[in-house]
């Protein structure tokens, strides 16, 4: 069966993740409940005529994908597969508000068009004039992993050699106010918002666009091989460990083979037990990393997690800022990622050095 | 050689019927489901017609026996109804007995609830439960929970081709051995959001949509849900299951032309059909019926027609029809609805009529089948195209 | 008429987010679509709404826009002839 390699990365996030090596400029913000992305200079990547109607998510997606392609040194791809939990929600908001406020009159199409979930993938295709396979997944916190799994299958089916895969989500004011109301986002004035050992419900929200160029061949820019991806809709806390071992076993591995486990801790006291059970039991002696203190929580934050995993393998270090337990290994070869959101949409992703 | 992935169950609820059987009766009796809108209050109700499921949300809640504190969107409710029917026809009693997945599709998700309560959430705490039902994935989770399914659950949203892509992914997951069984399809309820969105694009008809007619004036929106059960040949053999038809071909390509419009020559559509034929290992002349996307917008039918001419030749195009005059355009669900109709065409050896057609288009000599036609149907090709140039083609084949 | 043309230029820049284009760069007879300003069919739909909202002119067929929105000159002439507000 053909293998899948990560050959290029592009990341627009709350941190400075472009023009940097690996989180050396990262800063933890424990005072805010909403973290905005550090924006690149869009006009370096997108023409003024094209940019004027683009949503934030579209712009970030285009820039992140261009960075990934540049790093992988590819100019065309055989498939574009994206994941997004909410799509370009800012435009959805704009259109919906206009409908209500203007009583369905004098509406214009631009924000409606942008609100379609596949708009990022479509605009990347338009920019690249890429007529290939183009899909978008929208399923909460496994939106990105669905795209990743599809891409891996495409390479295994020998239907594609070079694939652009990415996760994109954006914050929008009214939606975040609703998420605060519903308790998904932490309350104000309860900071500092620490992700580990948190005592309050909800999470600090972020946004971002993280893209990967996947190829069937190893080359000088290769970060890691993607060994496997598994998606499960629902698990009880006490099922996580057995599911995790079954996943490793299916790949001929055991816990001791894992050099770092990257966990999706988001500081929600209600659901972090899903990570704790792995952190405090099977993987007690394994180096552990966490990242949502840097990226914030969002539906496709796990794409940022995979970016972290790939960088660990490439740089052979787990920066202190993401280390859970300060354990080290002489070499970082095999990395397991686990993520879930509110007890649903669980994913296990396995990558290794090659 | 196998003719593709087995379909062992289907379920549907649309403007022309609440079951597969009811839909079939409407299809063969030209019973259009396009009417004035009743369940949504909109200022456009006098000037547009829609394909609406004539059941209120309260009726749907009662039918599904949901608890009073449920937070189901209409999209999730009609999706659950269709998925349950599909499971029943496939005679699945223990859903997690095999590696089973659900690949859903939606474009609006829970928008119907979001738009109904948008500014009221801060006023009424009883509404807050609906905030989480906005996103697309919520619909799939609700359906999976109602079916008791634990496994791979995901959702595709590529506008109006969404469900075709969910059927395609489901077939690939079985083909690759990742899953033994997968429930695939899509659901979209009518919403003010989409009604107004399509209105801004000026592609809504003020009358009844007339696909491939020279005087076509645009589409009627509709709402519907349909799901199909795909199973591996191992299960089919072991449990001696009845195979309704097979998913034999699939293809997706991007038009890469415009954010909403299709290209003049239908490049994306051409590539999608070409790919699906290749996967099915069929020649164009082996296709007996095309269920076209046929939305009746000036742009779609011209682009799709040109792509059909390129694949089949102007004089050799097989019988084709759009069933959207009956159901309306049901967006992310459309390809699942039309997958059910394609299977019905195969099972009953019929070509469904393309209603409301009068005048051939000037650009080419393609005339849809306008009356019910009985003939042997081995292979049906079904097209679905969406915004963002997303073009998908599925091919369904008789099992034996 | 000159004032109307100036007004249209301002509105086009605003409605279509043409922030990089200056008022004086748009000539009255420049093509707005295609090679000129580079506007496309979505812009045309935006302009149709502007006609309705600001001048009370309702177009039912988007194809009509092709002729009306040829240039600032043609737009101004059409609005002058047909405006309801």
Task: Identify the meaning behind each predicted range.
Chain A
Residues 1-135, 145-149, 153-157, 168-354:
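Conserved "HGTGT" condensation-loop signature of ketosynthase/thiolase-family condensing enzymes
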Residues 140-143:
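Catalytic nucleophile serine of serine hydrolases
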Residues 159-161:
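Alpha-to-beta junction loops
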